[in-house]
Design a protein with these regions (language model features):
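A composition/biophysics-driven feature that prefers long, compositionally simple stretches
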Residues: 1-217
Length: 217
């Protein structure tokens, strides 16, 4: 791999001796007044939080809208999603939501945000073809004590799926609605900061309980 790099590019083999982590490298190379741009939609909240708390100089962290930079970027995949038949997994979405809400109540949480696709696939029994070689659908979700919202890209679901999820107490909403809906949350919200992206995290305007997604247990 090192032989294929352009001149001036150095390969940093993470995990090797004397090779710093990305966070440590940035902390050691950014000076007062420097500006570090990042895409909050693909950068985890935990990475930016750790970078902010660990810095020793006064550099600025700036979330950049990459649509202004990558103007000819291909659209996200919009492959149709589908519900995984209960005979293959044994538990309905409603049953899983009841279990998650029990965990939320034990920890005094009013809401739970899930952004990791494997956790969403398990919780909502949803599958798709948006990720090559992986049965995942592009999605976000918010679960409250009374409601559940599944955020899917327009055109990836149909009326049959809407009705099926409605029977399990789930409302399908547009993919990008997650941001403003997050801002409306109140009380305490359960999030996995190592999974949620910084853009969604920045919209949280209430108390945060940091922890792994219950669906991981």
């Amino acid at each position: 791999a090192e032989k294929e790099l352009y001149p001036g590019i150095k390969l940093m083999k993470m995990g090797n001796a004397d090779v710093p982590s990305v966070k440590d490298f940035l902390i050691n190379h950014l000076d007062d007044g420097d500006v570090l741009g990042f895409n909050g939609k693909v950068t985890t909240a935990s990475f930016i939080i750790d970078l902010d708390e660990g810095r020793e100089t006064d550099f600025e962290l700036k979330d950049i809208d990459m649509t202004d930079v990558w103007t000819n970027r291909p659209e996200r995949s919009h492959e149709p999603a589908y519900i995984y038949d209960v005979k293959y997994h044994g538990q309905s979405t409603a049953q899983k939501l009841d279990w998650i809400r029990g965990y939320m109540e034990e920890n005094e949480c009013n809401a739970h945000i899930i952004t990791s696709l494997d956790d969403i696939a398990w919780t909502f029994n949803i599958r798709g073809k948006d990720i090559p070689h992986s049965p995942m659908a592009m999605a976000f979700s918010i679960i409250t004590l009374d409601n559940a919202y599944l955020y899917l890209q327009d055109g990836t679901y149909d009326e049959t799926m809407i009705e099926a999820y409605k029977n399990d107490g789930v409302e399908i909403r547009s993919y990008d609605d997650i941001y403003l809906d997050t801002k409306r949350l109140s009380g305490q919200v359960l999030v996995d900061l190592s999974a949620i992206n910084y853009a969604i995290y920045s919209f949280i305007d209430c108390e945060i309980m940091e922890g792994s997604n219950p669906s991981q247990y």
